[in-house]
């Protein structure tokens, strides 16, 4: 049965059609927001997947190029693998949805969002997230929703709900908040040093809007929602837990996980697991889920230690940061490098500078962002956690971590005019025991400064965790969580910023939301830790950006020419500019407004290229002294090349002060000589002279 529902959202109409399309999916919502159209579907397998100890949720965000009237590039002219932006959007949808599915549910679930039309006034990301929530809520898939998502921008200090793409381009804040009926469940932000109090206000402005959307979703579910289907629970039998505790008492498990060394803990758990496998050798059913049971036992033990005893696995106080270390210039010959270590987490970051033409080209649905000059990439090899796995390129997690660190530094980057470089920073994870993304922020800041990148202020990142009890008031916020506290805790609240404000937030949780009290405490705690990291660690390693780029980094000369002269500089089919490049070994980029960028490593060659371009792009003036190479000899004189494609004639009468019978008596092919421009003759031709060059000419 086809039904349509509508509400006003930020001055635009949001329409949800149910029962119109994709009727064979468990749930489908055909979403219209302005002229933005997204089809969101939710489907689940009939039976649980065997042999897994996690919920197999897959979220897809498909960018169809026809949505913006484009044909995809490439040989096949069809959409290929998901873009980086599509992957990041999928993660934003996944993070608030995942905690609301039952923890013992093992059926495969796919949430698919197909962007079919894009209205620049209405961001498809918001529509896709709302569509996923609605499709799941009205389906028969078990889900403890609804949840809603809102974006907040800020221009001139005023909050804007669901800003347009044009408003986002000039906004000081790009905030996305997802909420349940009472609590915040996901936060994602990029900001231009927004004060903590202002950020909290923005978060709860979004939360307020989300409550109206949730009422709208409730009305849809009331009319067309399906009863939730029963499912086969994959919960661990209580009898197994009781048997495990008989063999491994709580005190023994507590002793096993209480260590500041990750490998020691893992070895302790391995010994316990082997003992249990031996004890349950005759019970195949228990052996099949023993690994998950031991994991759950560890989790309960660690949570009790933290919440009841205020005792962290590595012995730190609740607000204590792990030992920190920072150093720069650890890799020779690269343009900039730094290493940041926090406990058993270690990141090496390397910066590479290149001309602006090397900026990444973006072929997506956002017509306001077609390229980016700053790229941060994050790698997580298996050796960083002591494992052996083949390297298959970056996965969604790596792309997400790289994007977070990138977003954290964008607000402090110099403008293109101040620093005309494309910048690539790569974070290599040497060791991992939690918070590698935040260590990447610290390392990339120092690496950029070491490379001579004049960032406005240093940026640091820190993560807070959470362990909750039975009530909203029974909780503990942990500063600087390690891997174990991330796995067994309820929250990973990452905040990056400068001394003056927040530049990025990413909050993931495993429970059904956070109260305002927890959000405020976590943000306050991260500010305190961030100040310490900046002042006591990073600024002692490198206090300010280097004044010049490194020895091996390319240098750049910028100049302006008359746009009308661009054709002469380029030459027919690029002949002139390629001749300059071949001779000098530099890289030259010219924009339509006449801005020229000359990039190279040898200053003399860059200066020569600049001189050539100046000669080509300007008219000769009387009295101008030039150096030219003899490229052709005629009976009446010699032709000199002053720059590729720019020639002039020295008449035989101007070769020497005495009478010259033959041109070859004075010059030969290939000679390099100085000449002076004599101005134009009666025919309007520019003439040059060797004999009239002043004696003191340089």
Feature map (PLM): residue ranges:
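Long, basic N-terminal domains or extensions that often function
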Residues: 1-232
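Extended amphipathic alpha-helical scaffolds
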Residues: 1-45, 53, 230-369, 554-568, ...
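Glycine-rich, flexible beta-strand/loop modules in the N-terminal catalytic cores of phosphate-handling
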Residues: 25-110, 115-117, 122, 188, ...
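Conserved phosphate/anionic-ligand binding catalytic regions in large, soluble enzymes, centered on
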Residues: 27-29, 122-141, 328-351, 433-453, ...
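Flexible glycine-/small-residue-rich
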Residues: 33, 42-44, 61-63, 113-117, ...
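Flexible, glycine/charged-enriched surface loops at secondary-structure junctions
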Residues: 103-109, 144-146, 213-231, 263, ...
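Mobile "lid/hinge" segments at catalytic clefts and subdomain interfaces of large enzymes
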Residues: 140-257, 448-547
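Single-stranded RNA-binding regions, centering on S1/OB-family and related RNA-binding modules
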Residues: 552-556, 563-698
């Amino acid at each position: 049965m086809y039904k349509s529902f509508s509400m006003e959202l930020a001055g635009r109409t949001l329409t949800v059609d149910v029962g119109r399309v994709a009727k064979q999916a468990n749930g489908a919502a055909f979403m219209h927001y302005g002229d933005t159209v997204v089809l969101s579907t939710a489907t689940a397998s009939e039976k649980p997947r065997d042999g897994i100890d996690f919920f197999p949720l897959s979220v897809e965000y498909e960018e169809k190029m026809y949505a913006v009237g484009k044909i995809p590039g490439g040989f096949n002219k069809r959409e290929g693998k998901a873009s980086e932006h599509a992957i990041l959007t999928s993660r934003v949808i996944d993070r608030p949805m995942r905690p609301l599915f039952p923890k013992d549910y093992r059926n495969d679930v796919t949430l698919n969002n197909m962007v079919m039309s894009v209205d620049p006034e209405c961001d498809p990301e918001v529509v896709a997230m709302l569509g996923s929530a609605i499709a799941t809520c009205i389906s028969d898939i078990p889900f403890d929703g609804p949840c809603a998502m809102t974006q907040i921008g800020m221009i001139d200090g005023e909050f804007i709900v669901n800003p347009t793409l044009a408003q986002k381009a000039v906004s000081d804040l790009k905030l996305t908040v997802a909420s349940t009926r009472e609590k915040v469940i996901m936060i994602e932000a990029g900001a231009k040093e927004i004060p903590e109090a202002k950020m909290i206000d923005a978060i709860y402005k979004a939360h307020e809007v989300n409550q109206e959307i949730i009422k709208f979703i409730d009305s849809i579910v009331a009319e067309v929602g399906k009863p939730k289907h029963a499912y086969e629970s994959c919960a661990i039998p209580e009898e197994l837990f009781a048997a495990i505790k008989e063999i491994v008492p709580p005190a023994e498990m507590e002793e096993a996980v209480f260590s500041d060394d990750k490998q020691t803990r893992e070895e302790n758990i391995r010994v316990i697991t082997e003992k249990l496998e031996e004890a349950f050798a005759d019970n195949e059913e228990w052996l099949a889920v023993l690994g998950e049971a031991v994991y759950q036992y560890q989790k309960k033990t660690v949570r009790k230690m933290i919440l009841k005893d205020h005792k962290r696995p590595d012995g730190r106080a609740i607000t204590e940061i792990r030992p920190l270390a920072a150093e720069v210039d650890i890799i020779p010959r690269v343009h900039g490098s730094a290493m940041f270590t926090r406990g058993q987490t270690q990141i090496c970051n390397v910066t590479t500078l290149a001309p602006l033409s090397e900026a990444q080209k973006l072929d997506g649905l956002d017509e306001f962002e077609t390229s980016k000059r700053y790229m941060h990439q994050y790698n997580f090899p298996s050796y960083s956690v002591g494992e052996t796995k083949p390297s298959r390129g970056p996965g969604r997690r790596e792309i997400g971590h790289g994007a977070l660190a990138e977003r954290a530094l964008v607000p402090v980057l110099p403008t293109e005019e101040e620093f005309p470089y494309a910048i690539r920073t790569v974070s290599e994870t040497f060791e991992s025991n939690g918070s590698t993304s935040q260590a990447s922020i610290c390392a990339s800041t120092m690496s950029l400064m070491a490379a001579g990148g004049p960032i406005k202020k240093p940026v640091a990142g820190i993560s807070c965790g959470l362990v909750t009890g039975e009530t909203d008031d029974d909780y503990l916020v942990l500063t600087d969580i390690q891997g174990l506290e991330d796995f067994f805790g309820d929250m990973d609240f990452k905040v990056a910023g400068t001394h003056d404000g927040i530049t990025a937030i990413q909050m993931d949780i495993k429970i059904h939301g956070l109260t305002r009290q927890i959000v405020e405490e976590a943000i306050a705690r991260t500010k305190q830790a961030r100040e310490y990291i900046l002042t006591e660690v990073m600024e002692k390693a490198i206090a300010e950006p280097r004044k010049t780029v490194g020895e091996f980094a390319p240098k750049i000369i910028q100049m302006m020419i008359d746009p009308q002269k661009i054709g002469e500089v380029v030459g027919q089919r690029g002949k002139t500019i390629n001749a300059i490049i071949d001779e000098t070994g530099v890289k030259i980029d010219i924009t339509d407004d006449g801005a020229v960028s000359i990039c190279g490593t040898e200053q003399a060659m860059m200066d020569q290229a600049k001189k050539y371009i100046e000669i080509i792009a300007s008219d000769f003036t009387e009295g101008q002294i030039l150096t030219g190479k003899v490229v052709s000899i005629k009976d009446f004189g010699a032709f000199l090349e002053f720059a590729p494609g720019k020639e002039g004639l020295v008449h035989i009468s101007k070769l020497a002060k005495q009478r010259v019978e033959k041109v070859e008596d004075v010059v030969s092919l290939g000679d390099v000589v100085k000449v002076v421009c004599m101005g134009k003759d009666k025919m309007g031709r520019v003439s040059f002279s060797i004999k009239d060059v002043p004696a003191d000419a340089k």
